Amino acid sequence: MEEESGEELGLDRSTPKDFHFYHMDLYDSEDRLHLFPEENTRMRKVVQAEMANESRGAGDGKAQRDLQEEVDELVHLYGLEDDHELGDEFVDENIPRTGVSEYPPYMMKRRDPAREQRDWRLSGEAAEAEDLGFGGWGSAGQCQDLREAYRYTHGRASEEYECYVIPEEEDEEEAADVFCVTCKTPIRAFQKVFDEHKEHEVIPLNEALESAKDEIHKNMYKLEKQIIEMENFANHLEEVFITVEENFGKQEQNFESHYNEILETLAQKYEEKIQALGEKKKEKLEALYGQLVSCGENLDTCKELMETIEEMCHEEKVDFIKDAVAMADRLGKFLKTKTDVEISAQPEFEDQTLDFSDVEQLMGSINTIPAPSAPVINPQVPNSATGSSVRVCWSLYSDDTVESYQLSYRPVQDSSPGTDQAEFTVTVKETYCSVTNLVPNTQYEFWVTAHNRAGPSPSSERAVYMTAPSPPIIKTKEIRSCEEAVLICWESGNLNPVDSYTVELTQAESPEASGVTESVVGIPTCESVVQLQPGRSYIIYVRALNMGGPSVRSEPATVHTIGSYFRLNKDTCHPWLTISEDGLTAVRSERRTPARELSPSDTHFTRCVAVMGNLIPVRGHHYWEVEVDEHLDYRVGVAFADVRKQEDLGANCLSWCMRHTFASSRHKYEFLHNRTTPDIRITVPPKKIGILLDYEHSKLSFFNVDLSQHLYTFSCQLHEFVHPCFSLEKPGCLKVHNGISMPKHVTFY
């Protein structure tokens, strides 16, 4: 299609003053739709239909001329003078017209100036039927892809009619709705059928959008990961840079120190050699000087003798003979003297052999790293040990190079002198070591040395570490409980003392409390009273603690907070009584031999054949029952722990009891305290006696369990804790029932 420049030229011309331009956005789409009930109607068909309706008007000629002038001005305005076929479509001289009001004001749609001028699209079935086109603007088939150029609208502003030219804003291209996978570009759906994308793979645009977003997110994740890796690498490079500088400084300092040491050694050797050479020079010169002095003295003597002899030769004969004899003796003695004419000291010096072995050693040590300094061993971290292992840590100066460490340890010596403990060593690469196979609750002494090619470092200071204790052992037979608390006793399980103990308890058979563990910490002794909730079952553990850490849990013990539970105390038992294994039954057997008198004791009964029970020291309500034979003589009640063991129960102010005696088919009941009893008759002998100890109201009550009958109540002065007491005055047995709920009839007393 040819490129038209007339549109752009026409836009630059001045708009006639008789025409008013309105933007298409001033009209809603709904306002325009009702004017065009059929979309894509050919303009020629519309114009001819309207012109046919105008033929009935009387002023058709004038209106036709006015319209023609307006069309000409529009054509001139938009540079369409050369498009003759467009003018032919707008004007038909054979068709008369009525008023302009029959014609809606028309407008023209503009293309983007950067785009080519497209054909005017006259879509619709009428245009195809008449085979109409726009001449040079293209055929009807080509007009399918063109935009609509002109529309006619009409309106009445006043009694006179006016034609408006309303330019419409350029339409955006129709949005793409599919994505061509082959071309990797969004397209419209119909292009898949008719365009070059016919054989290409297409997917919905939303699917392509989600796929692109996922791909972008994956790439962003990869980029973030790569950024992190590069940042880490950059940090590592910075560390390497710093390390290179540090190592350079170390090597420079090492070289400088070694070379200075070598130079000092060489200077020292030079001084030593020069000094030795000077001493030899001095010796030679002294020897030569002595020899020179001796030679001079001999020479002077020779000259003197020569002069004397020459003088004698000039003397008279008599004088000559006299002097000659003396001179001959003197000359003979002189000549007999041996004159050393050999040089005593040679001028040459011996070749000096230089020993550079130590220098060579120093030179060889330039490339050798120095031995490390002594490591610094850290003190033990609390709660870091187990019963058989400890974790030992130490540190080293950063300037030292270490290839390995040697950790040594031994148990701390006890008080016995002369006992040497075996030492153990472990070689490790790290600055820590977990030492295993140790004895629980034992102190060990540790020290460490660092090693490299230059040798070992000095030993570090010695540090004492301690292993965790062994688990305690709960004394299940000594557990006492009531509805509000439990008394737990245990053995330490360790030879050495520990710092403290911890009691851990968990509710048993309680889904809502599953896994919840309560702890009582800082217990200094091997027993503890723990407050609990009534009517529950608990699983209890005990741990021992020291500086090294806690021990593992002890074996569990189960307690129930239902009533009061206790056992008979064998330490207070009279020798004639036998306590069952469960600690709830006391038996007195027949004795065939006469009983000998027992020595008094403050711990067990010696006169009254009795035994005490270990009741938990908790104030509140305590209830237990005693099963007896109705023909048995017995006493049951309570007493203070320091009650006199040489007296019967109820015979003093420290005990309260119910006494039953059977004689001559008669039952006698007494409620004794300080040897006094009220006058009470009991008609039905009880086989099971219920006893209620009420600390809150300082009362002690007795009941006939089978009849739910109240027997008697003491008002006591309970300034301390009391314990149950049981006495058999004749052979027989009684059984204690405890750990049971308090009956309802007991609560009224």
UniProtKB/Swiss-Prot annotation:
Entry-linked InterPro entries: B30.2/SPRY, B30.2/SPRY_sf, Butyrophylin_SPRY, ConA-like_dom_sf, E3_ligase_FN3/SPRY, FN3_dom, FN3_sf, Ig-like_fold
Domain B30.2/SPRY: residue ranges: 546-744
Domain of life: Eukaryota
Signal peptide positions (record): none
GO CC, one annotated term: perinuclear region of cytoplasm
SMART domains linked: FN3, SPRY
Coiled-coil segments: 205-317
Domain called Fibronectin type-III: residue spans: 375-470, 471-564
Keywords: Coiled coil, Cytoplasm, Nucleus, Repeat, Sarcoplasmic reticulum
Membrane-crossing segments per the record: none
Localization terms from the record: Nucleus; Sarcoplasmic reticulum; Cytoplasm, Perinuclear region
Subunit structure: Interacts with CMYA5. In cardiac muscles, identified in a complex composed of FSD2, CMYA5 and RYR2.
Name used for this protein in its record: Fibronectin type III and SPRY domain-containing protein 2
